[in-house]
UniProtKB/Swiss-Prot annotation:
Entries under InterPro entries matching the protein: Alpha/beta_knot_MTases, TrmY, tRNA_m1G_MTases_N
Residues reported in the UniProt entry to bind S-adenosyl-L-methionine: L129
GO BP term, pick one: tRNA methylation
Name of the gene: trmY
A Pfam family reported for this protein in Swiss-Prot or TrEMBL: Methyltrn_RNA_2
UniProt keyword terms in alphabetical order: Cytoplasm, Methyltransferase, S-adenosyl-L-methionine, Transferase, tRNA processing
Cell compartments where the protein resides: Cytoplasm
Source organism of this protein record: Methanocorpusculum labreanum (strain ATCC 43576 / DSM 4855 / Z)
Protein name according to UniProt: tRNA (pseudouridine(54)-N(1))-methyltransferase
Amino acid sequence: MLRFAVIGHKAVSTPDFSLNDMPGGAGRMDVLCRCINASFFLSHDLRRDTECFLILKGGEQADPANTVTLRFSGEKIKSLNPDERSAGALIKKALVTIPEEEYQRAAPGISIRKSGLAKLLEEHPFAVLDENGEDIRTAETLPENFILSDHQNFTEEEMELIKDLPKYSVGPRVLHADHTIIIILNEFDRRGEQA
């Protein structure tokens, strides 16, 4: 199972956002929607052995008390279409569910809980995508879990949490998070490994 965790630094964690204003009023939710689509879509199918975690930090005034994690499972997800609005609608629907400490089903293939990066790192051995990391094309083996940031850099607190994790790069240039996910999945495909 491949896993991608994307931190949405300004992403709202309540359902009261407009699907017509995901870049602004929803805190760059559009970036996260593209990451969901990149994680799952093939030309005529979905990647069923992939999960995508979105860590929504609660909007402009990010507050750890408002941070939620959404887990999207390719094995069970329904009603996902290859456009940002479809992914945004699924996020909005999931956020109607009041999060608790453990994952709760919010929709088919989507779970929500009240937590952030620290708890996710306790559960899975993640690697960080960083332009200064080991190149995925020359790495002998690749990890199955990757952390990415949205359009912003990791915060100091996040850097402290991930400082000892292995770092990998998809190349010499900084790319959008969704493009990076596609390149990683392509590398797994080229190696003939399940993704």
